[in-house]
């Protein structure tokens, strides 16, 4: 009985934490973000200009920009559609209990895992759908006006807290508020795209069976000494994502791998080996690779000299975003305008959605409004992600990224480098992990180092 009472206290405590976080972050979500019409907006490799959209000097945050070889001028709706189409993964509550804990929410501690999920989700979007893909229903999401965000938050948590007191533990999925446009796909290609869209989101479901779900990521984190409720830094999450992809058994995921840079160095031969390790005479296709590079943009604070570097990274068509944030908060950085970064915030706590249900609601997996913050507020610890479809794509990307690093670096040495050869050629050999021990001894040492370096996340 005593243990049961303790569990109930813990559950009530998480309710209060969730309520506080939602009250706090709903104000941020409802606050309008403004974009200048005189500066380009860049979003994951595409560039949008709003200069010719209208005569107002400022545009509300529901518009944005993206980067590529071409510029999209004067079309706020195109940016908005592009931004909303990115997959948004946030705190959730009332999901199945995490093993070896009483936790049914990640509110207050899971934000870096969520931003890592968002980066991986963007890599999967590129892999299966391509950068040009946008969600047909993106512009039909209900407006997150100032009244609805706040009132819904209050109503939701009043009901949620009352339910916890009465012992009502029923799981509820949010009602669909999208216009009834689904199911009217014009062709087989659109049907296929929507199927992959749903499949990708389902891989991040909050249940033990989801290949990239929170429960699975926490299991991999245990191998590094982490547990549910602990804080995770960007570098640790990079290694957890790598293990999650390596261990994924879904047939659609066999053509993808993840490489994590060692000490800010990408060893080209190691990357190519990962891309070609399963190539046979009957199947000459290379694997696609997501390259994750943990870096530090300064000492205690971010060095503003690295601003051009961050801009350069987010301007590349290969970029899938940055796991970063500001002290005590993790964000998924996807673009910029002038000296401000554009991000998606995982701190808004939403209800559990059962993604195993056919036609589960998609609305809560897409953010209706981008947010901006000054580069100066960025915490120096972050992880940068790139996607390359094949070996040829990787070779081209490494050349382009190297040029960008040289141009943007004001220091004698760039933040990270691409080096020909294998890591073992430079005496950085890491012990191979056995099936029982998913992380090598060197990786365990890295986890301990990363844990002491990185900021605390709430």
Curated annotation (Swiss-Prot):
Modified residues (Phosphothreonine): 452
Regulation of protein activity: Inhibited by N-ethylmaleimide.
GO cellular component terms, A-Z: cytoplasm
An MF annotation (GO) of this entry: cysteine-type peptidase activity
Coiled coil spans: none
SUPFAM superfamilies: Cysteine proteinases (SSF54001)
InterPro entries: ATG4_LIR (IPR046793), Papain-like_cys_pep_sf (IPR038765), Peptidase_C54 (IPR005078), Peptidase_C54_cat (IPR046792)
Keywords linked to the UniProt accession: Acetylation, Autophagy, Cytoplasm, Hydrolase, Phosphoprotein, Protease, Protein transport, Thiol protease, Transport, Ubl conjugation pathway
UniProt subcellular location: Cytoplasm
Family recorded in the similarity comment: Belongs to the peptidase C54 family.
Function (record text): Cysteine protease that plays a key role in autophagy by mediating both proteolytic activation and delipidation of ATG8 family proteins. The protease activity is required for proteolytic activation of ATG8 family proteins: cleaves the C-terminal amino acid of ATG8 proteins MAP1LC3 and GABARAPL2, to reveal a C-terminal glycine. Exposure of the glycine at the C-terminus is essential for ATG8 proteins conjugation to phosphatidylethanolamine (PE) and insertion to membranes, which is necessary for autophagy. In addition to the protease activity, also mediates delipidation of ATG8 family proteins.
Protein name listed in UniProt: Cysteine protease ATG4C
Native source species: Mus musculus (Mouse)
Originating gene: Atg4c
């Amino acid at each position: 009985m005593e243990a049961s009472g303790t569990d109930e206290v813990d559950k009530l405590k998480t309710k209060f934490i969730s309520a506080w976080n939602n009250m706090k972050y709903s104000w941020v979500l409802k606050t309008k973000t403004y974009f200048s019409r005189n500066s380009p907006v860049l979003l994951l490799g595409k560039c949008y200009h709003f200069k010719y959209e209208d005569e107002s000097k400022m545009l509300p945050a529901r518009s944005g920009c993206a980067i590529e070889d071409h510029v999209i001028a004067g079309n706020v709706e195109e940016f908005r559609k592009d931004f909303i189409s990115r997959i948004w993964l946030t705190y959730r509550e009332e999901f199945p209990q995490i093993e070896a804990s009483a936790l049914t929410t990640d509110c207050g501690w899971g934000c870096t895992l969520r931003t890592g999920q968002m980066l991986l989700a963007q890599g999967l979007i590129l892999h299966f759908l391509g950068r040009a893909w946008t969600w047909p229903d993106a512009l039909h999401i209900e407006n997150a006006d100032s009244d609805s965000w706040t009132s819904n938050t209050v109503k939701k948590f009043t009901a949620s807290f009352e339910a916890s007191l009465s012992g009502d533990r029923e799981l509820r999925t949010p009602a669909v508020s999208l216009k009834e446009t689904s199911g009217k796909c014009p062709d087989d290609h659109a049907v296929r795209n929507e199927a992959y869209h749903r499949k990708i989101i389902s891989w991040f479901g909050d249940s033990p069976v989801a290949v990239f779900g929170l429960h699975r990521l926490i299991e991999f984190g245990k191998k590094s000494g982490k547990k549910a409720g602990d804080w995770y830094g960007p570098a640790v999450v990079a290694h957890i994502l790598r293990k999650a992809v390596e261990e994924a058994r879904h047939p659609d995921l066999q053509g993808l791998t993840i490489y994590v840079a060692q000490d800010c160095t990408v060893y080209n031969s190691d990357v190519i080996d990962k891309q070609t390790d399963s190539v046979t005479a009957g199947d000459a296709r290379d694997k696609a690779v997501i390259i994750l590079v943990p870096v530090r943009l300064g000492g205690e604070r971010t060095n503003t000299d690295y601003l051009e570097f961050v801009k350069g990274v987010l301007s590349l068509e290969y970029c899938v975003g940055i796991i970063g944030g500001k002290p005590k908060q993790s964000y998924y950085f996807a673009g910029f305008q002038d000296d401000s970064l554009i991000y998606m915030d995982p701190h808004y706590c939403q209800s559990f959605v059962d993604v195993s249900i056919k036609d589960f609601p998609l609305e809560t997996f897409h953010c209706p409004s981008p947010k901006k913050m000054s580069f100066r507020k960025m915490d120096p610890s972050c992880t940068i992600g790139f996607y390359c479809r094949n070996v040829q794509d990787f070779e081209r990307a490494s050349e382009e990224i190297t040029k960008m690093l040289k141009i943007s670096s004001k220091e004698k040495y760039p933040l990270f480098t691409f080096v020909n050869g294998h890591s073992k050629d430079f005496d950085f050999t890491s012990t191979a992990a056995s099936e029982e021990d998913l992380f090598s001894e060197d990786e365990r040492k890295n986890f301990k180092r990363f844990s002491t370096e990185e900021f605390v996340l709430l």
